[in-house]
Amino acid sequence: MKAMPWNWTCLLSHLLVVGMGSSTLLPRQPPQLSQKPSFVTFRGEPAEGFNHLVVDERTGHIYLGAVNRIYKLSSDLKVLVTHQTGPDEDNPKCYPPRIVQTCNEPLASTNNVNKMLLIDYKENRLIACGSLYQGICKLLRLEDLFKLGEPFHKKEHYLSGVNESGSVFGVIVSYSNFDDKLFIATAVDGKPEYFPTISSRKLTKNSEADGMFAYVFHDEFVASMIKIPSDTFTVIPDFDIYYVYGFSSGNFVYFLTLQPEMVSPPGSTTKEQVYTSKLVRLCKEDTAFNSYVEVPIGCERNGVEYRLLQAAYLSKAGAVLGRTLGVRPDDDLLFTVFSKGQKRKMKSLDESALCIFILKQINDRIKDRLQSCYRGEGTLDLAWLKVKDIPCSSALLTIDDNFCGLDMNAPLGVSEMVRGIPVFTEDRDRMTSVIAYVYKNHSLAFVGTKSGKLKKIRVDGPKGNALQYETVQVVDSGPVLRDMAFSKDHEQLYIMSERQLTRVPVESCGQYRSCGECLGSGDPHCGWCVLHNTCTRKERCERSREPRRFASEMKQCVRLTVHPNNISVSQYNVLLVLETYNVPELSAGVNCTFEDLSEMDGLVIGNQIQCYSPAAKEVPRIITENGDHHVVQLQLKSKETGMTFASTSFVFYNCSVHNSCLSCVESPYRCHWCKYRHVCTHDPNTCSFQEGRVKLPEDCPQLLRVDKILVPVEVIKPITLKAKNLPQPQSGQRGYECILNIQGIEQRVPALRFNSSSVQCQNTSYSYEGMEINNLPVELTVVWNGHFNIDNPAQNKVYLYKCGAMRESCGLCLKADPDFECGWCQSPGQCTLRQHCPAHESRWLELSGANSKCTNPRITEIIPVTGPREGGTKVTIRGENLGLEFRDIASHVKVAGVECSPLVDGYIPAEQIVCEMGEAKPSQHAGFVEICVAVCRPEFMARSSQLYYFMTLTLADLKPNRGPMSGGTQVTITGTNLNAGSNVVVMFGSQPCLFHRRSPSYIICNTTSSEEVLDMKVTVQVDRARIRQDLVFQYVEDPTIVRIEPEWSIVSGNTPIAVWGTHLDLIQNPQIRAKHGGKEHINICEVLNATEMTCQAPALALGPDHQSDLTERPEEFGFILDNVQSLLILNKTNFTYYPNPVFEAFSPSGILELKPGTPIILKGKNLIPPVAGGNVKLNYTVLVGEKPCTVTVSDVQLLCESPNLIGRHKVMARVGGMEYSPGMVYIAPDSPLSLPAIVSIAVAGGLLIIFIVAVLIAYKRKSRESDLTLKRLQMQMDNLESRVALECKEAFAELQTDIHELTSDLDGAGIPFLDYRTYTMRVLFPGIEDHPVLRDLEVPGYRQERVEKGLKLFAQLINNKVFLLSFIRTLESQRSFSMRDRGNVASLIMTVLQSKLEYATDVLKQLLADLIDKNLESKNHPKLLLRRTESVAEKMLTNWFTFLLYKFLKECAGEPLFSLFCAIKQQMEKGPIDAITGEARYSLSEDKLIRQQIEYKTLVLSCVSPDNVNSPEVPVKILNCDTITQVKEKILDAIFKNVPCSHRPKAADMDLEWRQGSGARMILQDEDITTKIENDWKRLNTVAHYQVPDGSVVALVSKQVTAYNAVNNSTVSRTSASKYENMIRYTGSPDSLRSRTPMITPDLESGVKLWHLVKNHEHGDQKEGDRGSKMVSEIYLTRLLATKGTLQKFVDDLFETIFSTAHRGSALPLAIKYMFDFLDEQADKHGIHDPHVRHTWKSNCLPLRFWVNMIKNPQFVFDIHKNSITDACLSVVAQTFMDSCSTSEHRLGKDSPSNKLLYAKDIPSYKNWVERYYSDIGKMPAISDQDMNAYLAEQSRMHMNEFNTMSALSEIFSYVGKYSEEILGPLDHDDQCGKQKLAYKLEQVITLMSLDS
């Protein structure tokens, strides 16, 4: 159904409402209103998104701007009125919109996005601006949203066609007696000609007035607006200014913006667009926008830059924050939210910061900038508005705080960023909005976040830090939008997301349950209402003004102490006294409660309250089995409020739970031990005897610590124990016993108490099971009277032991602990005690006995059994009786007949010997191991049963044979006998390969890192044997990761990720990693080839308390590629984890019943990740039973086409690393069709056949129309083809004829070389005409003598090498010493040292050597050396060549350079050149090529010379399409052919006079009253416009202003003088350092645009006929080839001259050879032998540093004028020159830039010239220092007096003044400087130069 136009919809709605008698418009279905626990939420229509929000400060009503609707809501978010604004038929390309005039573009139903919503309080109306119809606005009555007006018929009514809600901001400025103003700032979406980016408009009282939204001021020249120039879009095609916030304060209006940087910041290597945030300021009363100033803003914390503005809000400082910041409480503060970095992406970084700016400080910074600019310092610095820097103009005037600018020095930019004060940062949940206010002197900020949370922040928190005191989840999904608003009473906050509007209280005091929590929360709204025991605002607490009723500080909280604070559970009704603090007056009474145990009245006496402990009947509930005490809360309850208002802990303790004396008396409570009753009690009077009471631990009966108690098994022995305070059993009590718990069996032994300090367990034998334990610790307990334990605090144990257990050999027996007294009984051959060995039958050996050596040593094992013949193998020998000391075996070991030296470290007495093999003889092959213990007698000798073999090891191969430089490759080396020996070392060259494992046929090792790409020889060392084979391992450059896709996964991981990079095939076990929450998660990857691999995203392990709907970003994300560290963390990716899909169960029963063929629907959420950019899907697999089904996915459901099954089957969904079963599905079988169903099917089939026949008839008719259309298109294609052929034919003909003509034209032209001084000044100080070094130093007379004396002394210091080097190094180390300063100092030093070039060269060499050292130390690539001009040394090098190559330029290289310049100029002028765009028919630059067929003729005019009327007429070739200015310039070139440019008259100063017959004369001009204007386009006058015929006579006459053209001239001069100074050619001799595009900018005020040959590319309003004449624009690229061919000879000639060692009779300048030799010496010194590096150094040093500068800027050498098209062509030649010097290979394709493709075939031959040139120079004999010094002295002498040395020294000294302390520091501390007293001398200079002296 076609959508109904919105105006008809409104009309019908209105009629319905009137019919129902209602007075308000209501939506058809009331939007949902939902109530959260404490939040009220409003949700609109499902298809609507909310855009803007504003609250009426007078009524509290809310106005909500949404897509297609405006709502008026009550303060509790109930809908009062709605007003529909869309959708409607529109097309963004319709300008003016279709409601004004018919639009040819196709129309479609278009939503109306609300872009601006403002309340005009003065006129009681709402201004609502949308995106429809190029951004028109409605004015609605606040009461009922009745439309008061909707102006749309003028272009001022179209604000902007941008379809984004956050792109427009408006500020209303109110006046009491005049109409208000509306300042509007908007993005323009690439249409700067239609919409100003910032403007001020009229707000008329009458909403339907004609002047509504008209510019406040608008005349022919000036208007209250600023447009973005079209030139800005040529630099950055998608440039726009995004306005984030706006406000008015004082006399100014401010806007905060986000806009692309015109110039990338230093160090930026990426092509990604960099953005900057700026504050824009305008005077409220400024109608011409001369007060426009913009300042960059940002903030930084802990080294992190936050530069992307997200939101802002203006508030006051408040008293507390004001004191911290040093401002008044009512001063304006700007609260801002920035995100990290400067790159604005769809996926902005989550790191963000809340920063504050003091508005007064920003204004002070602007005032400083205005003052400096009006002193003539710096440039206007507004790159987007003034593409070329315009210098500030000086003017004597006073600039105060309210200065509003003049028509000079405006608009103005501030280059230095104003840094805000960062008060809070958030790393994970990006902040997106901010609002702030002051509450009771505290400054509070409320911040919305990306995940829908609200952060409440106290900016003036404790210790000067911001305090985030609460976080609230407000929005269900999505971020909080920028617009937030307070309710009328500031007690509620309205928070908006795209789908909901929520009301949130500014405070939630009620959530805090205690005074400490309440006052410790940091929320200044909250205090403690004491007797109500609640946290609330003060005004909500009853009688809060009375003393101590309301606590607002922690120290005011109620505190209690109770005496006593504990009692025994056996005590009842004890009087307790409570001391109270901070308690209010309690006249109504108070109760004491012990939790729920008991409650009684309290007696209030002053600040004391008396209560009684619970009665006897209530105490049993307190006694517990756990522990000896129970804590209850003793609470005070107010009888006035019935609320508990204070409490303290009270302890009931129970002594009777203790069953030992020590635990009893060491209890913290009043417990006593009754020694004779063996009980613990709180009442000592219950003990039987007075002497039996124990209170101190030292009085307890207890065993004392004894040494180890050793008891051999089966030996009868008593155990004596030391003790103290042992009680004497009383009558009727039993005696003492010892209890030993042996392997779980209790053994009781009678004990005898000798006295109170000794007890003995009687004689008994003990035993335990098993021979695998040689000693067993046993618990020992002493008891009396049957069960009264004696405390054993030392934990004494008895150790039972068996000598024979685990000591089967003599050696092991004698190794036993000597305290065991074990020995070896030889006859039975076992380990026993002496008494168990029969003395008459056997010998008993003990360790301490004489000759106690064990006989019969035995070897059981040797490891290894093979080894290399060279020795060094560590052999491990294991066995029995292998000696008891190392000396026993130290020299008695042989292996296979070879001495093996035992090692002390490996020796284990009696059990193991480790020895190192000596070298074997060739005749030795194998043998046994033989040892002697102490002496080599048979009974002390042993021989192994195993043989030890000597092996020869060989290597065969290694795989893989290449790996990354970082190492980590697992390499397998194959060979024979590789398991021999004990120690293996594998080396790849000098790099170890870490041994992993081996077998007889292979060794596996892991490579370590290498610092360079090299082939390494493989060496294996086994013990002392080195094995070599011709095996080579190749270290290759590390893999790189170029791109991964997608950059997201779900939390459960296993999402497939494609990875592209280089050298990926080197990696054996690639893995992907993500670190989150401190834990690393890894998954596998599979390499496909060298450039591709696939990975499975790692899963994240999130905790159970994690919110499942949150997006996660890992702290680290990267790849584990063997040992490549650089890819462990990928900095350039923002890998994101989205929530896992969540499925719902089919039903509570888990069974879904379906018919066959019915799709199965699985409902859930997060089924499609919310990835920016949209179209992404997860790979779902759904199984029904075992069969998969076809799946269709949407946001909230999976639709599964059920397979051909019947019956009950389980459904399983799998995605990523998770699977889920929503339940079972039951598919019932089909029933057979009934008769009615069959009839229905037959009827439907018949209807279908009829329909198909009708479609076929329609198709036949349509195809006939298509054939006719095809024929028409064929004819048009034929016409186009013929035009293309003609163009190609013309280009070929031009190529053949132009070369001859050009060569003949250039013959004999004089070369206007600049003199040496002018030439050097243009290179050293570009753009500065009258530099101080060209004139005498100007000093007031009274200071002249001292200054000259000081400068002479300073000159001596400059001529001191130690000082000069220290001076330069110190300056370069200063952060504020800019690149411009470095170049300036280098040039000034060279001018001072012009007369001492030998010394200058020596200093330069030293600085270059230092630069090379620094470059290599910082690990930069050597090729980067001298690439840029970032140091004094590099600029000095440029200047050095400038001085020394002047002669070579004049005698040799200047001629081909001038010829090339003239050739380009003449060739360009042979064809049309567009005076507006600078494009030409003939060009080398694609950017400056006219891509259209321009019809033109060549005319020859006869020109009368302006200097001599009687001289012969000069024939001049011109084109009939030339503008009058172009004709004048060609005539001047012809007349003054050999005259330098600076000596010619200017075309602007001359008029062109056409002299017709009969003395008639006519002045021709670019613009006059005959100029044609069509559809806002004004075409410049051409020769054809005036119909000047071939052969006409013209004359150049001096400029005259006549009545005829006065109006026109004044127009041009007024425009030029005000807004467009930067676009007029200035008359200074050096034309420009950059190319200038000739432009005459469209007249912004009148809307008229100028054109010459082609209309500007940005304008889309060319007629169809214009388009038809264009053809395919790329066809005209053949003209580039034609031009290139014409100029080829001149390019070749120049390149050949520069790259020849001897040419045109001139020898190679000595400077070149000398400097190249110096670079070679430095390369040798640092071991750099890579020829590419040396080649690059030389290229960076001379061709790219000097020659490219000369080629691009021939005006540095010649007195010429360079126009923009010539500049563009020279840039192409210079780029070719640079490419020729490069060593890298240029890979070109069809998408490569045309200038690269143009010379692609020539560059290889040019590269050969360069290489030959460098090679020839290298072969030339070296220049001695004497010869070079003589040459330099001669150069110094020739140009000695070119510069004023005193002036140059004075300029250098200005840097001493700026950095005096920093320069003096190193001079004081350096020994060499100290010896020469350089610091003292410099201080003398400073004294002499100071103004005070």
Swiss-Prot record:
Major localization listed first in the record, in broad terms: membrane
Signal peptide: 1-23
Pfam family, one: TIG_2
A cellular-component GO term for this protein: plasma membrane
Cystine pairs: C94-C103, C129-C137, C283-C404, C299-C355, C373-C392, C509-C526, C515-C557, C518-C535, C529-C541, C592-C611
Known tissue expression: Expressed in the developing nervous system. Widely expressed in both the central and peripheral nervous systems. Expressed in the peripheral ganglia, somatosensory, olfactory, visual, auditory and equilibrium systems.
Function summary: Coreceptor for SEMA3A. Necessary for signaling by class 3 semaphorins and subsequent remodeling of the cytoskeleton. Plays a role in axon guidance in the developing nervous system. Class 3 semaphorins bind to a complex composed of a neuropilin and a plexin. The plexin modulates the affinity of the complex for specific semaphorins, and its cytoplasmic domain is required for the activation of down-stream signaling events in the cytoplasm.
Name under which the protein is recorded: Plexin-A4
Species this protein is from: Mus musculus
Organism phylogeny: Eukaryota, Metazoa, Chordata, Craniata, Vertebrata
Encoding gene (name): Plxna4
